Amino acid sequence: TFDLSAEGDRITISHAGGDPVGLDALRIEIGVDGEKLAHQPPVPFFAAEGFHGGPSGAFNPETDDEWAVGESGTLRVAGTNDPTLEPGARLTVELFHGGKRIASLSTRVG
């Protein structure tokens, strides 16, 4: 299982339970108020269009190859991405591993 939080332009996803997830086959889809972001984050990345550089944890290329329970990943959506994260917006994140959806998460942006 995974937990999702969002504050300002910062999105944090935490691995809360279950098997470790190999990052080599992980894909993330992010949406705001029902609309997918124009630019989706590759995993892992250091710099990517539509995102501030230097994500932490599971999304940073310097991390382990597996995302284990208790570990988090944080990224920041840049103002050049569309739609932007606004307070109160409904943020959705879907995690896919090897083409199979492993999590569908939702929260309000704080």
Model-derived features: where do they sit?
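N-terminal export/assembly leader peptides and their processing motifs that target proteins to secretory
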Residues: T1-G110
